[in-house]
Design a protein with these regions (language model features):
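Acidic, surface-exposed loops and disordered segments
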Residues: 4-9, 18-199
Length: 199
């Protein structure tokens, strides 16, 4: 009887483990037990979106996350343009070579930097853009970084439709929304890229 009981206990434990594991796969979590790390590892570029608006509260949180990025000497040279105007989005999508997905998005955030305030604005703004992408991921949204800087033609397109002052330079356009398809994150960890004490 004891053997049967032990066997049943073991069977139940194994079933629970399999169920847990399959639940993690369904959610797409990496299972580190650390929510911040899981979110980083789960981030992926999403280029197709549902025709559904994103709540203002979520957009505000994305912007707040962007402004929480580190910046040299705490200058915070970033500026953000939130675009929801359909004509502007479609015009930029038509003119930017790698931003065609903007036609599907209901919104985009343009991350910009004030070149008059910081020579390294693009470094600080890159950190801000990454925070925005991670915030989107954490809230079940999909987003993708499409570069404007350092390409003069792309920067000019963004400048044209958003009326940026001369000293405000667009780093990237981030279209975002609720994902239309289920994307999987890429496994990017590569031990060969790690060096200790010297290359």
């Amino acid at each position: 009887m004891k053997k049967i009981f032990s066997f049943l206990c073991m069977l139940m434990a194994m079933t629970a483990m399999i169920s847990c594991s399959s639940s993690k796969e369904e959610k797409g979590t990496t299972g580190t037990g650390n929510a911040a790390l899981d979110n980083i590892f789960e981030r992926k570029s999403v280029r197709t979106y549902l025709n559904k608006g994103v709540e203002k509260e979520k957009i505000d949180l994305m912007l707040r996350a962007g402004m929480s990025a580190p910046s040299g000497r705490d200058v915070r040279p970033w500026e953000f343009v939130v675009v929801s105007d359909r004509a502007k989005l479609d015009s930029m999508a038509a003119a930017l070579p790698y931003a065609k997905m903007v036609t599907q998005a209901r919104n985009a955030i343009i991350v910009c930097g004030d070149s008059a305030r910081s020579f390294y604005w693009y470094l600080d703004c890159s950190a801000a853009a990454q925070n925005i992408l991670l915030a989107a991921e954490s809230m079940g949204l999909g987003a993708v970084w499409t570069a404007a800087y350092p390409y003069e033609d792309r920067m000019e397109v963004v400048r044209k439709y958003t009326h940026l002052p001369e000293n405000i330079l667009p780093l990237c356009v981030i279209p975002f929304g609720y994902p239309a398809t289920k994307e999987q994150p890429k496994q990017k960890y590569d031990e060969k890229k790690i060096h200790y004490n010297q290359y």
